[in-house]
Amino acid sequence: MAASAKVTVGSHVWVEDPDDAWIDGEVEEVNSEEITVNCSGKTVVAKLNNVYPKDPEFPELGVDDMTKLAYLHEPGVLLNLKCRYNANEIYTYTGNILIAVNPFKRLPHLYGSETMKQYKGTAFGELSPHPFAVADSAYRKMINEGVSQAILVSGESGAGKTESTKMLMQYLAYMGGRAESEGRSVEQQVLESNPVLEAFGNAKTVRNNNSSRFGKFVEIQFDQRGRISGAAIRTYLLERSRVCQVSDPERNYHCFYMLCAAPEQETERYKLGKPSTFRYLNQSNCYALDGLDDSKEYLATRKAMDVVGINSEEQDGIFRVVAAILHLGNIEFAKGEESEASEPKDEKSRFHLKVAAELFMCDGKALEDSLCKRVMVTRDESITKSLDPDSAALGRDALAKIVYSKLFDWLVTKINNSIGQDPNSKHIIGVLDIYGFESFKTNSFEQFCINLTNEKLQQHFNQHVFKMEQEEYTKEEIDWSYIEFIDNQDVLDLIEKKPGGIIALLDEACMFPRSTHDTFAQKLYQTFKNHKRFGKPKLAQTDFTICHYAGDVTYQTELFLDKNKDYVVGEHQALLSSSDCSFVSSLFPPLPEESSKTSKFSSIGSQFKQQLQSLLESLSTTEPHYIRCVKPNNLLKPDIFENINILHQLRCGGVMEAIRISCAGYPTRKPFNEFLTRFRILAPETTKSSYDEVDACKKLLAKVDLKGFQIGKTKVFLRAGQMAEMDAHRAEVLGHSARIIQRNVLTYQSRKKFLLLQAASTEIQALCRGQVARVWFETMRREAASLRIQKQARTYICQNAYKTLCSSACSIQTGMRAKAARIELQLRKKRRATIIIQSQIRRCLCHQRYVRTKKAAITTQCGWRVKVARRELRNLKMAAKETGALQDAKTKLENQVEELTSNLELEKQMRMEIEEAKSQEIEALQSVLTDIKLQLRDTQETKSKEISDLQSVLTDIKLQLRDTQETKSKEISDLQSALQDMQLEIEELSKGLEMTNDLAAENEQLKESVSSLQNKIDESERKYEEISKISEERIKDEVPVIDQSAIIKLETENQKLKALVSSMEEKIDELDRKHDETSPNITEKLKEDVSFDYEIVSNLEAENERLKALVGSLEKKINESGNNSTDEQEEGKYILKEESLTEDASIDNERVKKLADENKDLNDLVSSLEKKIDETEKKYEEASRLCEERLKQALDAETGLIDLKTSMQRLEEKVSDMETAEQIRRQQALVNSASRRMSPQVSFTGAPPLENGHQEPLAPIPSRRFGTESFRRSRIERQPHEFVDVLLKCVSKNIGFSHGKPVAALTIYKCLMRWKIFEAEKTSIFDRIVPVFGSAIENQEDDNHLAYWLTNTSTLLFLLQRSLRQQSSTGSSPTKPPQPTSFFGRMTQGFRSTSSPNLSTDVVQQVDARYPALLFKQQLTAYVETMYGIIRENVKREVSSLLSSCIQSLKESSCDSSVVNSPSKSSEENLPAKSSEENSPKKSSEENSPKESSGDKSPQKLSDDNSPSKEGQAVKSSEENSPASSWQSIIEFLNYILITWKKNYVPLFLVQKMFSQTFQYINVQLFNSLLLEREYCTVNMGIKVKAGLDELESWCSQATEEFVGSSWDELKHTRQAVVLLVTEPKSTITYDDLTINLCSVLSTEQLYRICTLCKDKDDGDHNVSPEVISNLKLLLTNEDENSRSFLLDDDSSIPFDTDEISSCMQEKDFANVKSASELADNPNFLFLKE
């Protein structure tokens, strides 16, 4: 319709709008697929196929019948309904369908006897649409055609179905006359049956105050004269569950509230009170309806019962049963003396039980037994079974529901019997008042049955509309083809098909006692998983969705089975059938013996389906008439028309489908005269040449080239969109004509204006040109005169200026020349004096410089001689040190070679033991392999049996087996890759052997370097002798004197050097002795760890490197000594020439010779060291050869073990794969357990087993050096396991704090950093540490224990966040600093690197975190959040108890201060004041270790004496239970919490978050309590609450912002509410003051609630002004219904994330933290002290 319409620029169209459904506008631009529309100033771009044409000639008040619309589409229908609704015309036809829009107000002009007279006998469609017209049409057809009629009224709850039904029955009663029946008219009885059924079958719902909770079909019988001769009422699916369950703000059935509002003598007889005292009624806060008096309705219902023939005795029995149901609801059950027995809870329950028994007129004990016990009849005997309290409560509710259902059925039967049916009547008019389509947030069995009814009626409706369309085409005698319409038969088959439908499956599930809603839902999923109308919600497990004609509806199956079962408990049946009250016993007649013996299961669904089928059979024999009731808005207020809401109802009611069916044929139908009048302009010649309307219409349509139209007898029938195309042609013709007219008019106006403008411009130009010429001539005259005047004036001025300038220049030149001569003379005098002064000063300066230079030269010479002597002494010292180092190195090498030989002998013995253990292990593995094969064979047999038994699920098992095979293939590929990795490692080991050959080559180079060293030493000695000889000759020749002090210093340095050499020799002897003592210990350690050979080789390599370094340093020093000797020779010559010393030279020569002899001794010592080095190298080569042999043997043994373990693991994996694929994906538990069983036997042959159960391969020897990264990582993974138990035993206790930092967290962190666990690829240490933190959650009641572990966990997490650095995606490790080459350099670097990490947060050590470390970090994060949540819930639980006591005390104090106390209020209305003893905070029995005192201020003298304990928080006596003491108990509890957290040094940001959420919880509890009851919204209550808030504010100020943060701001809702309560007088408060100044935070719902609750009837000044309340109420009506809750919600989320722990925790220096006392003396944890 929209796509085929021709849209041009200027056309008026409808465009979709999300707010108003459709808006109109004018087309501004048309593209190929999109158009631009101007909608009242707003430009909208829409697709061409999403717009509908608008009728520009639409009548202002709309049309009575929407089939007369030029464009029959959704926006046209909405516009027509809205125009008529605004004009109070609420009824509109759509063909034969009447649409009624509920006005929510009385319209007197539409009802009354006068209106009925107007419609009596009038043809359908002559008068305005009205239900009377529909009723009259049905009545006339029944009389004239002799066919029974039916009027179907449908619509949403609140759409006006009940009122429309009343009007229909009123009109039919008016038309049927007054045939008397036993003194009472039948029509009056039919009309009066409505209030009776409404009292017992209607209730208030969210959408309607008088919603029918049952379906009703009234059959009115007529005789041959058209008089009412009888009637029958049929009801469907009464909502039983409403008797026991009512949601707020709905109500139960009206009869309960009417009976409670009955006269006093009635309520006393039935022992009733207010509705709020009964559990079946007080589940909702709504007890009364606006504009409805329940007491008057009670009397009206009594009168209606009299009319329909229910006598007073029966009426008394009816209300006796209703009262008994109310008393049944107040019976509560508790556990009895036996374990699974139950009994009435208290005296109150026994009272209601007694009253209910009296009203039922049965035995009270029998009633109690029927509720608390069940009799199970077996073949031999009867067994009495006791019920628990929950089962007894369910039985009580079942009894109430079945009694009420029986009562309602009795009423319907009684009404039918009273009215009577005419057996001779052949024609009826049925009025169906049925519930409309329902879709709520929670849809149960009732909605399922209601929507099934609507599906049935919709199918009937579609078929009927299609038939009417057929009749219209046949009447006009046009050619038409079949019209396709939606057939919802597939939905009906889905629901009611037997077998296989949803109802059939539900009945089947109800017949099995063990069936639950879960099994029922799974059965539905399996049966209808491929059905296009059935779906399963993604996030639900038991819900299902059905695609109805009106939309998708999701049903919850929780109560389907219970609501579908229609049974009466045998005990209840027997009890009530034997009642002394005849009315009660008539409700439960005794069952026939045959039916009781052979009872067949009957369900509500099956009964309802049968009733529905009977209804449709009745409707099929009648001619239907349809009335669709529409609710214009959800506010239930007049004059509000919501387009989207109405459009949804029209779709659900099938109106739009009827329109679609109409549009599928020929929706546009115009009479000939109207068609020609509208479109004559397209072809004027057709109307001029012919007066035949039919012929003219055909010519007109042929000219516009329209296809597919039909010409009927009286009308033109157009297809969908053809009317828009005709309007488009008409708009083009009108537009073209308008443009021609506009062009001619504009041409005439423009020409006329141009001629006038031309004449005027000619005159103006002549005048202007004359004026311009005159002005130009005058200007030329003035310019000529001015030039002559200027010439004369300039000549005179120039002459005078020249004369003055000449005289001035002569005067100035004279003065300047004189001044220059004087200046020149003065300069010459100054220059002569300056030369004289400079010559004297330069002479003096040269003399002084010469004196200073001479003195400095003498001083420099003396200092230089001292420097030369010291340099020589330093060289001698260095030579002595190098000699000692060589001796030490040689001794160590000898000792290590001896140790290596002894270790080799031990290794041979160990290899023999390994071979024996290997053979034993192979035998064990073979036995295990045999067992596994047997298990495999048994498993296969079991599997084959299961497959044969479970052939129905063969497909699923094949899929699982396919997944298992894929997993096995993947595991096999992983094992093959692991085998390849092991082969690569073996190749690396062989490369390691080649490395020993490289070491031998390096040893040869060492020999060469030692020989070169010897040569250089000899050369240095030779040079030294030459220098000494030259010095002696110079001394003899020139008689120099050596500085005595320098020689003395040289001697002392020489003595020190000797002492140093002797001390080094003593140290070498001591090291030899220690080595002899420690060698046995090293031998035993070799037995424990096979990898010791790697350490020996690495030590040898390090020693080799050290020797190289020593040789290099000696060469460097020798070179320096050679250079120094040359320099000294030259310096000596200079000294001998410059100065002459006066000391005796002979003595000095002897000392020099003595020093030379000592130097020779040192050279001899060096040569002996070289010999020892040669011997050490030989021993090293032999050790290398032995190590190579040992490595080969170890590799062979490890290869055999690894192959056996690999085959073992593969077999175990196959068995585990066949047992469960899911278990393999999570963790290879079987392989892990098997590997751990084998690990003690082979622990000495390799690394320990990993977490996943695979054996870690032998660490490969790197290609170049033993100290590579992979080798060290394997070492660090094995090292700390033996120390973890000691660590865990220590930190699992409360080891306290040091300097305010947790010792346990820092100890764990230091150990993990020391052991390099964070860099390990696989480790089980984290799995052993995590349970330590998990143990803190086990004791959830100990706040002190939880706070201690929260501090430790958060601190450790903080350190990990600062330390761990995740590896880059490439996996390359960061660049490391260069490694020193010498042995001592590497040792010192190792000491520095393995020391305890610097824990200052400014320089936290960064490490590359592996996957186990990152997983450990995530686990710590989860524990921090869990501990925080547990502590918060403990605090909330205690605060809730204290607040309950506080609120109770406030209420009691306000009741004491009031003048009158209401004695009728039951104790149940009071807020329950829980004993704080139940939820008091439990203090830990353990005390923290001594902590350093902090300088924090304690709020309100925070001390341990003030902190509440279990005993201190018990329920106080009535004398102490005052508001002040209650608030004080809250303050004391907050003090206790703060002290606990401060003692445990909980991070400040966590403390602030905790108090913030605690105060938020206090705010929610106080604020909700104020808004829930009227007695709390008083000035006295506000003053008392304000006093308590002042106490909390004082506590916050004393506790300081450091701990509580902005917690005080969380009480803003309660504070503002209290301010409003205590403000006096309230009548002067304006709306702006209320919403801006006083209560800016509160919402409109909350303000309206407070203002309405704090009303005082006696004093108007205490009330808020009505204007303010009306403004708030107006805002409430405009706001969304979803924002109607005035209560606050508690926030239970975690208020921080992991990143906040790192950013919010204050940076601390952890360097000064003391270690735990238990680890202080342990030598393995000495690094903690560093």
From Swiss-Prot:
Signal peptide from the UniProt entry: none
Compositionally biased intervals (Basic and acidic residues): 1475-1508
Residues of the Myosin N-terminal SH3-like domain: 8-56
Positions of the Dilute domain: 1327-1678
Binding site for ATP: 155-162, 208-216
A GO cellular component entry from the record: myosin complex
Function of the molecule: Myosin heavy chain that is required for the cell cycle-regulated transport of various organelles and proteins for their segregation. Functions by binding with its tail domain to receptor proteins on organelles and exerting force with its N-terminal motor domain against actin filaments, thereby transporting its cargo along polarized actin cables.
Subunit structure: Homodimer.
Protein name (Swiss-Prot/TrEMBL): Myosin-7
